[in-house]
């Protein structure tokens, strides 16, 4: 009887140990999930592009001892490595397209340097001819409308072209605003209803969109939407990604797009300066136009990136809060001897 009692206690103790070990094994899995083959994340198995790049980040102490110049060069090298990793992770046909586009851009840059006077003169003549045609308004609005759908590109080019044709005018702003607002709303509705699964994939496309989604889940008012529309996110992809966030209404999204339409005057201004640069013959006027374009782009980029870093900071705060809540909700373990 004594032996059976000791055996029973041993089995009970073994069961408690198994339950205890199983609890912490589940806890470790929540913090560091396993890959498909049962190995830890440290092997880089099953990681996305963003996760795998962040695994190899340098320690803080290594960067802390660097001079400002060394930090700059370090960040440049790290970004180049990220681009190389992303390029080699693409399929062969995608790599070929990127290489061909790079060659085309290089050829266009060389032609622009050699024949810049003739090209600028042709731009002025063409823009004046397009302004005289009544159909130009409709064509521009249709093109701007369609580039609002992911994965279309060319919104900035079309917006600047509108400024090149109409300058900083109410006429140009109405054309650009109508195409932008209607295209964004239509893209949002399509991805919210018909292509919702695709919209959810766009949310997880990179960490910026995930940060955007986390902010909108906390507060999806049209003011927050308007601020996020000013962040440096791709125009068409943002329309689709916002549609993948639960709780955002078409009404709030529409109001946010209308509120941000004054930003479109920046594109009109840049386009008007490009045309003035082409029309001017004096070196002083061209330098002034070029400096105006650069300053405007710097202000726009600085404002957009400040908003983005504010968004990223808020995203990290939400992550820390959720992690703290999860830790507080863990069951308390009592150890009795």
UniProtKB/Swiss-Prot annotation:
Name it.
Answer: Golgi apparatus membrane protein TVP38
Q: Which PANTHER family does the protein's record reference?
A: GOLGI APPARATUS MEMBRANE PROTEIN TVP38, GOLGI APPARATUS MEMBRANE PROTEIN TVP38-RELATED
Q: Which InterPro entries match?
A: Golgi_membrane_TVP38/TMEM64, VTT_dom
Alphabetized Pfam families for the sequence: VTT_dom
Cytoplasmic topological domain residue ranges: 117-137, 191-251, 308-337
What's the entry's take on its domains? The VTT domain was previously called the SNARE-assoc domain. As there is no evidence that this domain associates with SNARE proteins, it was renamed as VMP1, TMEM41, and TVP38 (VTT) domain.
Mainly resides where? Golgi
The protein's job, in short, is: Golgi membrane protein involved in vesicular trafficking and spindle migration.
- Transmembrane is among the record's keywords: yes
- Region entry VTT domain, spans: 163-274
Coiled-coil residues: none
What is said about its interaction partners and assembly?
Interacts with YIP5.
Alphabetically ordered keywords of this record? Golgi apparatus, Membrane, Transmembrane, Transmembrane helix
Q: Which residues cross the membrane?
A: 96-116, 138-158, 170-190, 252-272, 287-307
The family note in this entry says: Belongs to the TVP38/TMEM64 family.
Q: Which GO terms describe its cellular component?
A: cytoplasm; Golgi membrane
BP GO annotations: mitotic spindle elongation; vesicle-mediated transport
Specify the domain of life of the species encoding this protein. Eukaryota
Membrane topology per the entry is:
Multi-pass membrane protein
Additional free-text comment from the UniProt record: Present with 11300 molecules/cell in log phase SD medium.
Instruction: Give compartment(s).
Output: Golgi apparatus membrane
Membrane side Lumenal: residue ranges: 1-95, 159-169, 273-286
